[in-house]
């Protein structure tokens, strides 16, 4: 009986450590996205390079989470809900890592292009701020098992999609430069993809809470 309690306590400690890791990964990813938006109007390219280098830390965090989940599944043989939690954690970690990649790609673009069109920058910044707000609210939804907020966050991705379409469907040349226009469209695409990854995380959280896929709910 004592051994069982010790094993259970150790297992719960490992789960808590996993929670901390995924929160840390989320915070670092949030910070990278925030910095990538700021660097669009930053005159110092060195800041963009710092973001690019930080992507390696995100990759390491995701790798460590994957290793811990595999170890827990192998050694503990978790029950259904815990297994669902671990599989969701794996997928969420992957989504965070991809978001960080997109943020790093935005920073890379800043090292080769400068955007002076205020209207363009405003729309790009708005896309980024909408994504950051979705991430912030998603953290609250996960902590409180708030399914209504999860669904609302998924719906809010439409606002990012609309801004993306406005940018890529613009007929005028940004700064009268085809290269700059192309780079701006890429930034918008990366921000749109960040929104998509947030939607994916929302659906993983919905699945963990309910045991059902979000698509099943909609149908």
Q: What are these model-predicted stretches?
A:
Residues 1-219:
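Cytosolic, long alpha-helical scaffolding segments
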